[in-house]
Amino acid sequence: MLAPCSGWELGCFRLCLRQVRLWAGAGRWACWACQARPYSSGGSERWPGSETEVPPPGPGRRTLKEWTLQVSPFGRLRARLPCHLAVRPLDPLTYPDGDRVLVAVCGVEGGVRGLDGLQVKYDEDLEEMAIVSDTIHPQASVEVNAPLKFGLDIKSSGSGCVKVQSIEGDNCKIETEHGTSILQSVKGQKLHVQTKGGKVICLGTVYGNIDIHASDKSAVTIDKLQGSSVTVSTEDGLLKAKYLYTESSFLSSAAGDITLGSVHGNITLQSKMGNITVDSSSGCLKASTNQGAIDVYVSQLGKVELKSHKGSIIVKVPSSLQAHLQLSGKEVDVNSEVHVQEMAEVRKDDVVTVTGLMNQASKREKWIKADAPKGTVSFRRQSWFQSLKLQD
């Protein structure tokens, strides 16, 4: 008898769907979502993240084939699959030496083709665990338990989704075509995620030097990123992050909006067509958009430079902030609740420039510069408590 597919596979995706729905609004899931149970609301059943598009669960999925291989604890996993893949660490109590890889293929019994073409092997010289197939059914799923410090090199084709949970290898590389990539509580020196048409979702805290690129209409949603260097880019999709704790971050989108919660460090934001929103900035912030609007709360100041070529800018600050101000736009509105000393106004070529000081700022590097030549610059007071947006 073949055992049922592990509860971790289904349970973790139920958790992901709940978190994604609450934070990311991720919409339709093409992968394991169809296996999770619907939940009831108001007497009717609904699916997390999509009320109409996700099909009802099919017959029970079972473990169809299993492998256990002895490996180096510091090797790497190379996977090339057209189906779903989930990777998590070995149980340290069961495998204290961390020298095994467990592989299981799950699917509807008798309904998964291409198992004979699935290669599962370990190369001792390269210290590389390979899982490769181009014939396995796209609705199958491969579950891997690997050593905690394993590196990852994963490519999925078609609609194959990838989830990596709690792995701490030096290098983690994930590439998908149309499947969703999920990183949950992952640590590494270098983390690279790329998708041509799927979503990228980071749950918990993801540590490392991080590079995420999402093409076409792919969205990127993030709980928390922490590391020295972070680069995240989208084309037409939303880029949304709750927390960034980095030395240097560069986030960009061609046409999608950039929506950030609390950010710390040197942050650069660029969007050609989309809007930029930052709930709280602590450090240096440089944000620019061609046609979109900018809305920023500056909680602690390094140097802030904001530019919207055709849109408007809203800058919110606490009353205690010390800063030099230079606000330029077709119109400039400084709220009366903000006390600005030495305020001066200059008009030239249909552009108004207002300069001044907040709270007798003495350090010249503490600047807020906002430039919206075709729009309005609004400067207003907001408390830190208001920035938390608890009503949401």
Curated annotation (Swiss-Prot):
GO CC term (a single one): mitochondrion
Pfam families tied to this protein: DUF4097
Disordered: region residues: 39-60
Full protein name: Protein FAM185A
Protein's organism: Homo sapiens
Gene from which the chain derives: FAM185A
